[in-house]
């Protein structure tokens, strides 16, 4: 499952601009590891891994909104 900047904004409680910055940074990390990325989206699994978030809680949060 991929999340967009608006989702990142809500999950991390940051501004929209910061949400885009987070996505760009994480996508760059994934590209350096050899993964293909989608501009403006980030896999929820990687977001949770990097920010030490509980993946199930984040998915539940997104499903409620």
What does each of the following model-derived ranges do?
Residues 1-4, 40:
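N-terminal alpha-helical segment
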Residues 2, 10-11:
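Charge-rich amphipathic alpha-helical interaction elements
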Residues 3, 62-65:
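Short hydrophobic/aromatic patches at helix-to-coil boundaries
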Residues 12-51, 55-62:
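Major-groove DNA-recognition helix of helix-turn-helix-type DNA-binding domains
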Residues 5-6, 45:
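Residues within the helices of the helix-turn-helix
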